[in-house]
Amino acid sequence: MKNKIKSLCLIKKKKSGRSRGKISVRHIGKKHKKFYRKIDFKRDKYNIKGIVESIHYDPNRNARIALIKYLDGEKRYIIKTNNLEISNFVVSSLNKISLNSGNSTIIKNINIGTLINCVEIFPKIGGIFSRSSGSESEIIFKDNKFGVIKLPSGIKKKISLNCMATIGKICTFNVKKKLYKAGQNRWRGIRPTVRGVAMNPVDHPHGGGEGKTSGGRHPCSLWGIKTKGYKTKKK
């Protein structure tokens, strides 16, 4: 792992879940300071080959990033895909190219059944879908104007054939999910969560009662929205 490239980094100010002094998002506090790496999600440097110079760690995402040095001297970060190693070449184009891992082109030029990542939902806005570690989408149908992709969640999405996508699956690595101390959550900006049954009735629908008993209602949030399987997404 190499050190960051300062010209490709930004200082991102933390809001800590506050909006003008008032808590707008609960359970969020100050986190460890880190630089934001500018990732090339648009892949709009067309028909210029680039070589993978090094692999970097990015604290803002759970996938590794690759530093690409193009033949004209410009450097950009992209999300590392499987089988993309140092000294490999990548290219982005609107025309047909070899479907190697890390290359980027429009959906029109990609075969059905190919695994892709960093998929645009509208042309020229940058990759939106399948950007986290180990994620992938699959092209399952194409016609003259549109294509259908299957997202990691199983949802099928209809998009334009002019949307860009990167070939391959996002790289995976072992992520330690076990927390050895409470401070590890504070590093991530996560504050403690108080249970509703431990509150007073004025603070939560589950509050009050004698001992550990509370009102006999279904599990719900602070604002009375049902939880435990209740779907909130509108179709």
UniProtKB/Swiss-Prot annotation:
Disulfide bonds: none annotated. One of the primary rRNA binding proteins. Required for association of the 30S and 50S subunits to form the 70S ribosome, for tRNA binding and peptide bond formation. It has been suggested to have peptidyltransferase activity; this is somewhat controversial. Makes several contacts with the 16S rRNA in the 70S ribosome. It comes from Carsonella ruddii (strain PV). GO terms for cellular component: large ribosomal subunit. This is Large ribosomal subunit protein uL2. GO terms for molecular function: rRNA binding; structural constituent of ribosome; transferase activity. One of its GO terms (biological process) is translation. InterPro entries: NA-bd_OB-fold, Rib_uL2_dom2, Ribosomal_uL2, Ribosomal_uL2_bac/org-type, Ribosomal_uL2_C, Ribosomal_uL2_CS, Ribosomal_uL2_dom3, Ribosomal_uL2_RNA-bd_dom.
